[in-house]
């Protein structure tokens, strides 16, 4: 059975979401500051802290109507390709972090938010990459 919906996982006040469509992971989100798109783009050397702060101010002025990624591209702070790489890295990092959890709670809701970005994430490649990362840290 290929499910569509949102898997919500929580642990020690942190909440992470994994979004599925027809059994495939299409996106992930998190309340962890380190999982934010801007922080990931900075970590990947695709964005400066100054440009991130400017884009966040623009986002506040738009009352959240414009997504951060769109503002970053519109203002020339990142290329569409770098944004795509950042989004995929964000999803991979969030899911990787879940493999490190030793406890927590979860629930699945057969509903996707209408405003999420939907990427194509190859689950087999993702799991292989996560196993390699875990082995490297061991």
Question: What is each residue range found by the language model?
Answer:
Residues 1-138:
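Acidic, Ser/Thr/Pro-enriched low-complexity segments and adjacent helix/loop capping patches
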């Amino acid at each position: 059975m290929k499910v569509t919906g949102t898997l919500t996982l929580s642990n020690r006040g942190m909440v992470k979401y994994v979004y599925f469509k027809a059994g495939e992971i299409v996106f992930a989100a998190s309340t962890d500051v380190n999982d934010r798109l801007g922080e990931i783009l900075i970590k990947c050397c695709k964005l400066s802290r100054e440009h991130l702060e400017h884009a966040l101010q623009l986002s506040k002025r738009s009352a959240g109507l414009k997504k951060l990624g769109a503002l970053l591209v519109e203002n020339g702070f990142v290329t569409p390709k770098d944004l795509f790489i950042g989004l995929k890295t964000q999803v991979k990092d969030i899911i990787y972090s879940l493999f490190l959890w030793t406890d927590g709670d979860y629930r699945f809701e057969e509903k996707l938010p209408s405003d999420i970005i939907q990427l194509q994430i190859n689950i087999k490649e993702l799991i292989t990459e996560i196993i390699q990362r875990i082995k490297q840290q061991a």
